[in-house]
Amino acid sequence: MYEIEFTTIHSYGSEREGISVPVVLKAGENSVRLAASIDTGATFCIFRNELAEALGLDSANATLKRFRTANSSFEAFGHEIEISVLGVTTVSIVYSFADASINKNVLGRVGWLDRVRLGLVDHDATMYLAPYDTE
């Protein structure tokens, strides 16, 4: 039998679509609180455009990236910021949608999932989380 240790347990509620968690994004002295969906199929972390504005991030100083999905494509601006989820904090490049009409916040593999240990028991709507480097 295998054992994995976690530092946090979170009940995410089975009545909602997807697995949503509380997130704090921070850039310099600015921070915003939001809910984001964990998406193991998403390569990157991508957030609503208005959150980048609230953090004081300037698209002129960002890395522009074009994303392609099965049925669409979109552009997003990348910035290095701090992400905190349930007490687990990391610094990562995350993206904000260039199109302000896209209303999604997603925690993806690169920059978040690759930095944590994540366990799910969906039957119980329970998530287990720890920083990856926890011994």
Located regions from the model:
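Pepsin/retropepsin-fold aspartyl endopeptidases
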Residues: 1-135
